[in-house]
């Protein structure tokens, strides 16, 4: 899709006149002319029009932002006044109106963010097109100067959103209406042992397209507060969130050896695959505390055990060389280190020395964390502006990092997007990464709002995704022999069509969403109260998009039908005789199995209850089947050609023509079958691909032709007195 069509499709109609006029600027560039001429007058006119468009967009941006701040400040004043000792309390009706106003502010923030991003992208594209058409009039430096005066690209909506949803949670907690959000637990429940056998830990990772990041943030903020990080150290949470850092820059330095053994172990899902990284927040200074994290992945799942300890920046070199003195750490911190921590440090040192580990990859991203302080039941991380940078010294002649040092100093003070780096030293990830960590009891379901988010059109789940594995696969491709599966789908658009996701019952997540919709309806009916409450946007979409219902025929009627028609035989049951489970089908024919009362028939087939994922081997199996059929065609065609050219015999020529027609029929059948299965794979249809009648018909036709050919040949031999009729059976069986 061209950008002119994209900006037209993304326009919010009430603000149409406030957008940049991209077609007009494109027309001024004379893109429609074959050999356009460009002079000073054309340049001056284009720059003046573009500057006026930029000022118009920025003025409207400031106007809407001012209105938003005024609305939020007004709600904040109401809430603050009610919290005073002698302040008037907020009634339930007033609280609902304030919540509606905050919801309106949230929707406006989403529209304003999309408006700003769309216009800013348009300006960058038109400047790039200008410099490409007329390189003698470089406009990019001038545009960068104008952007400093109209800083559309440096606008941060997260502080405003955090304030909105802080008020939102305060007002919602004062209402008695139930909520699907994770509730804030009392202090005496914060010390729950989530590592016990009663709880299960699950981790999900998703890719989020830049167009959906703001909507994902606003949806999560309705249910979880944003974590603030203290200015001293990132992993210490600021409980009051007043003077903290909202979206800190997080840096991870991964360690591996020249053979990338840790990468291979994690990619192959070994039983105990280690990962080792150095982690810190903000700029790296001599006083920065470095978090050493050792992770051990258990099998093929994303679950892993994680151990960590903290050291100062000046001690990292000693740790990597195996000369780290644990007793000095005790003196520096004036604490008595436990034996467990001492053993952890010794194990990490042993892991580094035995495997010759060294820093190879740096991962830098902006992290937005959502979690109730002190509660590990649900934690969500949203990592944006992710850049992967080589930190290795594998190339002796041109090392990216000084082999005598443990990190690159040219990156420590640099900022995103690190344009000073050479091509091939870094790679920018095009999406944001969403990670959901939940720890729930085995007898409980996950919160409904998380189920809605996981199955929505806003995010795309990637099984087994790892930042380290992706970074190595992109930047060190020539050093490794295996690549993760998701690398091959990087060029695909991860955005999903809203109508297809929520309306199509046979889509990738359609069947599961039908189930979620019905479960949500049951919960809403159970929790329904007279007080109005604001439903989540995803529930509204589920209600607005009607789906095809699943058959609700009573089980008794189906049993009656089976009892009445189960003993009848018809030709439609012939394919069933060819299945491998024929013996089991006849053995249990006519029997009725009684299931326990707590087991119910699933509303949807289990084989389509989750996302249908097509692996590469499915395509290869279809191609292999087609080639097998072509092999049969070639053999049959060769036989037909040999018979047709057999010493001028009319019988051989006749059957040569018959075999040729049969080969053409088989080739046409194989082609149609291959095309049909390819279409089913592309559409991810859950229908079976088995074809019973095709091989049966082809085999029968071939057998009949061979029998007829043999009978005619024998008859001709008898007719020519080559075989005596009374000795025919003797000739056949000797």
Curated annotation (Swiss-Prot):
Phosphotyrosine PTM sites in chain numbering: 583
UniProt xrefs under InterPro entries: DUF202, SPX_dom, VTC_Complex_Subunit, VTC_domain, VTC_sf
GO biological process: one example: energy reserve metabolic process
PROSITE patterns noted in UniProt: SPX
Transmembrane segments: 625-645, 651-671, 694-714
UniProt entry tagged with the keyword Glycoprotein: no
Subcellular location: Vacuole membrane
Membrane topology classification: Multi-pass membrane protein
GO CC annotation, single: endoplasmic reticulum
Domain SPX: 1-144
Pfam families per the UniProt record, alphabetical: DUF202, VTC
Region span, Important for inositol polyphosphate binding: 125-132
Keywords tagged on the record: Chaperone, Membrane, Phosphoprotein, Transmembrane, Transmembrane helix, Vacuole
Modification Phosphoserine occurs at: 181
Similarity comment text for this entry: Belongs to the VTC2/3 family.
Subunit annotation: The VTC core complex is an integral membrane heterooligomer composed of at least the catalytic subunit vtc4 and the accessory subunits vtc1 and vtc2. vtc1 is a small membrane protein without hydrophilic domain. Vtc2 and vtc4 are related and have 2 hydrophilic domains that face the cytosol, an N-terminal SPX domain and the central core domain. The central core in vtc4 is the catalytic domain.
Function: Accessory subunit of the vacuolar transporter chaperone (VTC) complex. The VTC complex acts as a vacuolar polyphosphate polymerase that catalyzes the synthesis of inorganic polyphosphate (polyP) via transfer of phosphate from ATP to a growing polyP chain, releasing ADP. VTC exposes its catalytic domain vtc4 to the cytosol, where the growing polyP chain winds through a tunnel-shaped pocket, integrating cytoplasmic polymer synthesis with polyP membrane translocation.
Domain notes from UniProt: The SPX domain has very high affinity for inositol polyphosphates. SPX domains may integrate inositol pyrophosphates (PP-InsP)-dependent signaling to adapt cytosolic phosphate concentrations to different metabolic situations.
Protein name: Vacuolar transporter chaperone complex subunit 2
Organism for this UniProt entry: Schizosaccharomyces pombe (strain 972 / ATCC 24843) (Fission yeast)
